[in-house]
C-alpha cells in the first residue's frame, strides 16, 4: 500500500511532466501569426520571450477545440507568477478575451529562461533588443529552475 508521502511524490511528478509536455505540445503547434498588443497595435513579432513575469507569448493551434464555428488559433501566454507557472489562452487577435487560465506548477524557484538559435549563444530575451521585426521562432528555449530543491534543465524547440 502506498503511503501518503509516496502518493504526493507521484502526483507532483505527474503534474510536472504534464506541464512540460503541454508546453512542448504548444511549441510544436505554434504558427507564425503576428502578435498585437492589448490596444491592437501590431508588434511585428510572432514570438516574445523574456525573464520577466510573462515568459512566453505566441500563437498556437488549439487541438482540444474542434468546434468549426470558432477559430482554432489561440494566443498562448506562459507566466511565472508567485512561484508558479501559469498558462493562459486568449483569442489569437484579442488578448483581452481570456479563454482559459490554469496554474500548471507551483513552488518553482529560480526560474531562468533563455532563447537562441544555438545552445552556445543564448539570450534572456527574444527577439533581442536590436531586432525591430521578427517573423521567426527561436530554435531553442531553455528553462532552468528548481522544485523542492531539485534542479531541472529543459531544452525545448519550436521545430522550425
Whereabouts are the PLM-identified features?
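Extracytoplasmic beta-strand-rich oligomerization domains located immediately C-terminal to a leader/signal peptide
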Residues: 2-94
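Short linear sequence signals and composition-biased patches located at protein termini or domain-edge surfaces
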Residues: 109-160
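Short beta-strand segments
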Residues: 74-76, 100-102, 150-156
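Short beta-strand-initiation
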Residues: 71-73, 99, 138-140
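A short, polar/proline- and glycine-enriched secondary-structure boundary/capping micro-motif
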Residues: 69, 95-104
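Short acidic, gly/pro-rich beta-turn/loop elements at beta-sheet edges
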Residues: 68, 88, 97, 123, ...
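Structured surface patches comprising rigid loops and adjacent beta-strands/short helices at the edges
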Residues: 28, 33, 102-117
